[in-house]
Amino acid sequence: MNKKKKKSENTIAENRRARFNFELTNKFEAGLSLEGWEVRSIRLGKAQITEAYVLLKDKEAWLIGCHINPLANSNKENDPTRSRKLLLNKKELAEIFKSTQQKGQTCVPTKLFWKNNLVKCEIALATGKQG
């Protein structure tokens, strides 16, 4: 029978489709610039990164397409798919920029997880699988 794998306690969301569609090479751990309502929603497990990707522009990395459902009792209009800045150091950004300039290379988010009460995003350099 099909048994669901248990997520570890610190894993919030996982992008299994990235492992299926891409061959992942180098992995990086990036912080996320979030608003308060987003952190509260993530604590309730309302985050999805299956359609997300990483956009590199102006020497910055952005997480695009990550869907975080707003809380039901929120009193203002919140955008669940807004662009969120990834926090990386200069050496990591330079390595990612250099690698993605090569033909066929891209950068995809693989999972969201907690680390010392902070939300982190694991991103990986990837090459599309042939076939």
Predicted segments, located by residue:
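Intrinsically disordered, Lys/Arg-rich N-terminal extensions and targeting peptides
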Residues: 1-35
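Arg/Lys-rich, often Gly-containing low-complexity segments of ribosomal proteins
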Residues: 8, 13-18, 47, 73-89, ...
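Flexible glycine-/small-residue-rich
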Residues: 36, 56-58, 65, 123-127
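Short acidic, Gly/Pro-enriched loop/turn segments at secondary-structure junctions
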Residues: 45-51
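A structural signal for short hydrophobic beta-strand segments in well-ordered beta-sheet cores
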Residues: 52-56, 112
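Helix-adjacent hinge/juxtasegments
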Residues: 55-96
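Beta-rich strand-turn-strand
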Residues: 87-130
